[in-house]
């Protein structure tokens, strides 16, 4: 059984990680341990580079905290070009896989508050009245009328980032 350390305690992210690992490696093939680690970037990262750095930093910090794991996974959400997206970084002892998620264009009223220094999650909670929306369906769930959720978009990116770990052509 794979010991997978999730560099987050966010339920939406953990669900995506667990579902993707089960789909790739088989149902029940992994145990997810979630840890809270720092990203080393602002709470609301801006740009692809800063967001990816946050995910890489979380993986590095999770590896230091739980060096005995088989995999370390981080999902860092950010804002880029008026849209929200995330970077997924997965490492094992030998390699790294990375993937960027789909992007969701954000309305001007939301972007204005985020650009003033507020994080997207709290802004969306104020807008919708849903407490801790970032730990649930997220802006993605709200603006796609539930057709997608934060977790479903993360799930796809985790699947993509896992590609080097189960396809021999990457080795």
From Swiss-Prot:
<dbReference type="InterPro" id="IPR029001">
    <property type="entry name" value="ITPase-like_fam"/>
</dbReference>
<comment type="subunit">
    <text>Homodimer.</text>
</comment>
<comment type="similarity">
    <text>Belongs to the YjjX NTPase family.</text>
</comment>
<dbReference type="GO" id="GO:0103023">
    <property type="term" value="F:ITPase activity"/>
</dbReference>
<dbReference type="Pfam" id="PF01931">
    <property type="entry name" value="NTPase_I-T"/>
</dbReference>
<keyword id="KW-0464">Manganese</keyword>
<dbReference type="InterPro" id="IPR026533">
    <property type="entry name" value="NTPase/PRRC1"/>
</dbReference>
<keyword id="KW-0546">Nucleotide metabolism</keyword>
<dbReference type="GO" id="GO:0000166">
    <property type="term" value="F:nucleotide binding"/>
</dbReference>
<feature type="binding site">
    <location>
        <begin position="8"/>
        <end position="13"/>
    </location>
    <ligand>
        <name>substrate</name>
    </ligand>
</feature>
<keyword id="KW-0479">Metal-binding</keyword>
<dbReference type="GO" id="GO:0009117">
    <property type="term" value="P:nucleotide metabolic process"/>
</dbReference>
<protein>
    <recommendedName>
        <fullName>Inosine/xanthosine triphosphatase</fullName>
        <ecNumber>3.6.1.73</ecNumber>
    </recommendedName>
</protein>
<keyword id="KW-0378">Hydrolase</keyword>
<dbReference type="GO" id="GO:0046872">
    <property type="term" value="F:metal ion binding"/>
</dbReference>
<keyword id="KW-0547">Nucleotide-binding</keyword>
<dbReference type="GO" id="GO:0017111">
    <property type="term" value="F:ribonucleoside triphosphate phosphatase activity"/>
</dbReference>
<dbReference type="InterPro" id="IPR002786">
    <property type="entry name" value="Non_canon_purine_NTPase"/>
</dbReference>
<feature type="binding site">
    <location>
        <position position="68"/>
    </location>
    <ligand>
        <name>Mg(2+)</name>
    </ligand>
</feature>
<dbReference type="GO" id="GO:0006772">
    <property type="term" value="P:thiamine metabolic process"/>
</dbReference>
<dbReference type="InterPro" id="IPR050299">
    <property type="entry name" value="YjjX_NTPase"/>
</dbReference>
<comment type="function">
    <text>Phosphatase that hydrolyzes non-canonical purine nucleotides such as XTP and ITP to their respective diphosphate derivatives. Probably excludes non-canonical purines from DNA/RNA precursor pool, thus preventing their incorporation into DNA/RNA and avoiding chromosomal lesions.</text>
</comment>
<keyword id="KW-0460">Magnesium</keyword>
<feature type="binding site">
    <location>
        <position position="38"/>
    </location>
    <ligand>
        <name>Mg(2+)</name>
    </ligand>
</feature>
């Amino acid at each position: 059984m794979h010991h997978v350390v999730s560099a987050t305690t966010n339920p939406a992210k953990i669900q995506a990680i667990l579902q993707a690992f089960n789909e790739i490696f088989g149902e029940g093939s992994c145990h997810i341990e979630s840890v809270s680690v720092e990203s080393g970037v602002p709470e609301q990262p801006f740009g692809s580079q800063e967001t990816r750095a946050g995910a890489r930093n979380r993986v590095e910090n999770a590896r230091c905290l739980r060096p005995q794991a088989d995999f370390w996974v981080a999902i860092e959400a950010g804002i880029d070009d008026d849209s929200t997206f995330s970077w997924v970084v997965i490492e094992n002892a030998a390699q790294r896989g990375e993937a960027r998620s789909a992007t969701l264009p954000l309305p001007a009223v939301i972007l204005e508050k985020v650009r003033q220094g507020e994080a997207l999650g709290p802004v969306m909670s104020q807008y919708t009245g849903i407490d801790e929306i970032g730990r649930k369906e997220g802006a993605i769930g709200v603006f796609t009328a539930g057709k997608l959720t934060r977790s479903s978009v993360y799930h796809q990116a985790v699947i993509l980032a896992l590609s080097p770990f189960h396809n021999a052509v990457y080795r």
